[in-house]
């Protein structure tokens, strides 16, 4: 136990001592050029990659800000026009004949707690069909 305490206090004393004085100026080796003209291939490649990344980022920023909103507006206008044409066409058609309702459709064991109790939460009168008088 005494040896463990001795090791602990030796480490503590080493940590509390003042740190070694370091040079404030970085040491330059004789082979390191001080000017920019002596860049090696790695540094030149890294700078080229950095420049390419900046240009590509700017390109996609411009596409996102100036290209996407008009494309979304055109697509939205097209969808709206097609939707209106579709329902305009359906309004001119004669009424549909009674649809066949199969035994596995619209099974109700009890009424829903909303509305008249027979329609689901997302019921759409112009699309969904339910014959209350069906015989199973």
Curated annotation (Swiss-Prot):
Transit peptide start-stop: 1-29
Topology in the lipid bilayer? Single-pass membrane protein
Listed Gene3D superfamilies? Cytochrome c oxidase, subunit VIa (4.10.95.10)
User: Might you report a single GO cellular component term?
Assistant: mitochondrial inner membrane
Give its localization: Mitochondrion inner membrane
- What pathway does this protein act in? Energy metabolism; oxidative phosphorylation
Q: Which GO terms describe its molecular function?
A: cytochrome-c oxidase activity; enzyme regulator activity
GO annotations under biological process?
Answer: mitochondrial electron transport, cytochrome c to oxygen; mitochondrial respirasome assembly
Q: Does the keyword Membrane apply?
A: yes
Tell me the residue ranges located in the Mitochondrial matrix compartment per UniProt.
Answer: 30-62
What CDD domains does this protein map onto?
Answer: Cyt_c_Oxidase_VIa
Q: Which residues lie on this side of the membrane: Mitochondrial intermembrane?
A: 84-136
Spell out where the chain crosses the membrane. 63-83
Q: State the function annotated in the UniProt record.
A: Component of the cytochrome c oxidase, the last enzyme in the mitochondrial electron transport chain which drives oxidative phosphorylation. The respiratory chain contains 3 multisubunit complexes succinate dehydrogenase (complex II, CII), ubiquinol-cytochrome c oxidoreductase (cytochrome b-c1 complex, complex III, CIII) and cytochrome c oxidase (complex IV, CIV), that cooperate to transfer electrons derived from NADH and succinate to molecular oxygen, creating an electrochemical gradient over the inner membrane that drives transmembrane transport and the ATP synthase.
Q: How does it assemble?
A: Component of the cytochrome c oxidase (complex IV, CIV), a multisubunit enzyme composed of 11 subunits. The complex is composed of a catalytic core of 3 subunits Cox1, Cox2 and Cox3, encoded in the mitochondrial DNA, and 8 supernumerary subunits Cox4, Cox5a/Cox5, Cox6, Cox7, Cox8, Cox7a/Cox9, Cox6b/Cox12 and Cox6a/Cox13, which are encoded in the nuclear genome.
Family per UniProt?
Belongs to the cytochrome c oxidase subunit 6A family.
The protein depicted here goes by the name Cytochrome c oxidase subunit 13, mitochondrial
Source species: Neurospora crassa (strain ATCC 24698 / 74-OR23-1A / CBS 708.71 / DSM 1257 / FGSC 987)
């Amino acid at each position: 136990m005494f040896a463990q305490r001795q090791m602990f206090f030796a480490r503590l004393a080493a940590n509390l001592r003042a740190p070694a004085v370091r040079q404030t100026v970085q040491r330059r080796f004789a082979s390191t050029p001080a000017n920019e003209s002596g860049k090696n291939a790695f540094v030149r490649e890294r700078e080229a990659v950095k420049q390419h990344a900046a240009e590509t980022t700017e390109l996609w920023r411009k596409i996102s800000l100036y290209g996407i909103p008009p494309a979304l507006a055109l697509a939205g206008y097209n969808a709206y026009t097609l939707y209106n044409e579709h329902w305009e066409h359906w309004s001119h058609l004669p009424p549909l004949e009674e649809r066949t309702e199969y035994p596995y459709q619209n099974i109700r064991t009890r009424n829903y707690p909303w509305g008249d109790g027979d329609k689901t939460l997302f019921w759409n009168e112009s699309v969904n069909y339910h014959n209350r008088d069906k015989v199973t």
